[in-house]
Amino acid sequence: MTDGERNTVFGEWIEAHKAILFKVARAYGTTHSDREDLFQEIALQVWHSVDAFRGDCAVTTWIYRVALNTALTWNRREGKHDRGRQDFEASTALLTAPAAHDPRLEWIYQRIAELDEVNRSLALLMLDGFSYRDMSQILGLSESNVGVKINRIKAALSAQLAKEEHDGL
């Protein structure tokens, strides 16, 4: 593939799937600056991965795989996972969708940020409607393990919501 062809494919992929990059950067970056850096790192890795895409899965699945692997590697390399979580309200400028200002969406993103790396990845994939099979392929887990983890995530989020509603938060 020539550089021109790679750039064309990359441009089409980014235009069609940039929301994935934003979501992953938002979920794994702890500050606005981190999220911007991570977004750029993910975009760079997507560009590098264009030649490796064989069409064995959907482009969306491929981009998610690249984005999540890049975020996990970046997080470990930068040591961001050891730092305290910061408030996500300062990051709304990163997302351009009007739904980003929905308090329910903000609540779910805050709770997702508190999850460990694998569960955070599963929660993002679940919100985007991926099947257990697709999630297992992206993350290298068995489908049954994905199902168990998703059920635990849902139960934990439901319990947290019930607690906050009970406490009047």
Range-by-range predicted roles:
Residues M1-K23, E36, W47, V59:
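A short, charge-rich alpha-helical start-of-domain segment used by transcription regulators
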Residues T8, R77, H81-R83, E89-A113:
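Acidic, proline/glycine-rich intrinsically disordered inter-domain spacer in sigma factors
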Residues I42, V66, L122-A123, M135-S136, ...:
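Hydrophobic positions on the alpha-helical face of helix-turn-helix-like DNA-binding modules
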Residues D37-L44, H48, C57-N69:
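Structural recognition of an alpha-helix C-terminal capping motif at a helix-to-coil junction
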